[in-house]
Amino acid sequence: MAARLCCQLDPSRDVLCLRPVSAESSGRPLPGPFGALSPPSPSAVPADHGAHLSLRGLPVCSFSSAGPCALRFTSARYMETAMNTSHHLPRQLYKWTLGLFVMSTTGVEKYFKDCVFAEWEELGNESRLMTFVLGGCRHKLVCAPAPCNFFTSA
């Protein structure tokens, strides 16, 4: 079973949280065309899956066809205009969890560069380019515990 995600803006930490929908989830799904969401499979992603990838700062579960368990992006206020309003990022991740398309590592990197960084470029705020991602699941960050840029070289 593929992971199902909900989004929650945490204004106290200025982060956008994407979390699996489960009985213990405190997040609320964003309104959208997704319908009812079901809990993820706890064993959907091998613990070492994606550990070799050069796309740094993302939990290794981000590269699974099951989708990420949880991602938290800093600079959520910048994302609010570019991403949250259209639900673009949650929609793409939801399609990914359903297996409607499969991204290679290059595809994932291109997706984040094009859809996240390119849209933030239009907002004209340089601080958003240092975007940090925290894992909220059992899959460890490639570069934990120090914050890192998405595209730090391996």
Curated annotation (Swiss-Prot):
- Family, as annotated: Belongs to the orthohepadnavirus protein X family.
What protein does this entry describe? Answer: Protein X
Swiss-Prot/TrEMBL GO biological process terms: DNA-templated transcription; symbiont-mediated activation of host NF-kappaB cascade; symbiont-mediated arrest of host cell cycle during G2/M transition; viral genome replication
- Give the principal location in a single coarse category: host cell
Q: Where in the cell is it found?
A: Host cytoplasm; Host nucleus; Host mitochondrion
Mind telling me which GO cellular component terms the entry cites? Answer: host cell mitochondrion; host cell nucleus
Question: Is Transcription regulation included in the keywords of this UniProt record?
Answer: yes
On subunit structure and binding partners, the annotation says: May form homodimer. May interact with host CEBPA, CFLAR, CREB1, DDB1, E4F1, HBXIP, HSPD1/HSP60, NFKBIA, POLR2E and SMAD4. Interacts with host SMC5-SMC6 complex and induces its degradation. Interacts with host TRPC4AP; leading to prevent ubiquitination of TRPC4AP. Interacts with host PLSCR1; this interaction promotes ubiquitination and degradation of HBx and impairs HBx-mediated cell proliferation.
Explain the purpose of this protein. Answer: Multifunctional protein that plays a role in silencing host antiviral defenses and promoting viral transcription. Does not seem to be essential for HBV infection. May be directly involved in development of cirrhosis and liver cancer (hepatocellular carcinoma). Most of cytosolic activities involve modulation of cytosolic calcium. The effect on apoptosis is controversial depending on the cell types in which the studies have been conducted. May induce apoptosis by localizing in mitochondria and causing loss of mitochondrial membrane potential.
**Does the record carry Transcription as a key word?**
yes
Residue ranges annotated as coiled coil are: none
Q: Which UniProt keywords apply?
A: Activation of host NF-kappa-B by virus, Activator, Apoptosis, Host cytoplasm, Host G2/M cell cycle arrest by virus, Host mitochondrion, Host nucleus, Host-virus interaction, Modulation of host cell cycle by virus, Transcription, Transcription regulation
* Residue numbers spanned by region Mitochondrial targeting sequence: 68-117
How is this chain modified after translation? A fraction may be phosphorylated in insect cells and HepG2 cells, a human hepatoblastoma cell line. Phosphorylated in vitro by host protein kinase C or mitogen-activated protein kinase. N-acetylated in insect cells.
Mind telling me which Pfam families this protein's record contains?
X (PF00739)
**Top-level taxonomic group:** Viruses
